Amino acid sequence: MKIFVCEDDQRQREHMVSIIKNYIMIEEKPMELALATNDPYEVLEQSKELNDIGCYFLDIQLEADMNGIKLASEIRKHDPVGNIIFVTSHSELTYLTFVYKVAAMDFIFKDDPSELKMRIIDCLETAHTRLKLLSKESNVDTIELKRGSNSVYVQYDDIMFFESSTKSHRLIAHLDNRQIEFYGNLKELAQLDERFFRCHNSFVINRHNIESIDSKERIVYFKNGENCFASVRNVKKI
């Protein structure tokens, strides 16, 4: 899930970015801070390119000709179930969100920093839960990567390949923009879906995310720029 922050106060924006990045890093959620800006048009343009639902933290009062509520209304035209959270110092403006029918997830008031952090994290947790539920309803294939006391849910389409780890009984999932170490078995992963193929003793690849194959050097290149080796026997089977 991609996260967008539109806030015209630079200090406030940087504080929100810090909260979001720390949450993603510590909790290892399948999320990415895609954009933090004071330009509502930049958020709108990038939101149109999403293949999945987004999560938007929007300041209601922006120093632009498009305020946060109007921005949310425009986002709703192409992301009807996205998570929209308004961040504001003006509680009296919240009624406008009902006028524009944007169905906001939450209203967070800036006045209390500790409350701000807690509410942002609550919204991210709720957005993550909604994403899992929507993925099941829309038959989007996901895999649970177990990391001991917690798990990370990842969509098949985000996986480039799996690799054996130097640590016993652990694997590394190479995703579009990050890596996750987890407990697993390559043999079992290769049997999950037809798109997964064990091309080497140490690798299971996602055929759907292959960019190209160098058969001579036995190297498989992926859409995110990474690569892995294939065995002599299996390179032709990919």
Swiss-Prot record:
Gene Ontology CC, one term: cytoplasm
CDD domains: REC_LytTR_AgrA-like
Chief location of this protein within or outside the cell: cytoplasm
Modification 4-aspartylphosphate, positions: D59
Pfam families per UniProt: LytTR, Response_reg
This protein's record includes keyword DNA-binding: yes
Record's keyword terms, sorted: Activator, Cytoplasm, DNA-binding, Phosphoprotein, Transcription, Transcription regulation, Two-component regulatory system
Stretches assigned to the HTH LytTR-type domain: 143-238
Places the protein is found: Cytoplasm
Domain Response regulatory, first and last residues per copy: 2-125
Transmembrane segments: none
GO molecular function, one term: phosphorelay response regulator activity
Function statement: Required for high-level post-exponential phase expression of a series of secreted proteins.
Protein name: Accessory gene regulator protein A
Record organism: Staphylococcus epidermidis (strain ATCC 35984 / DSM 28319 / BCRC 17069 / CCUG 31568 / BM 3577 / RP62A)
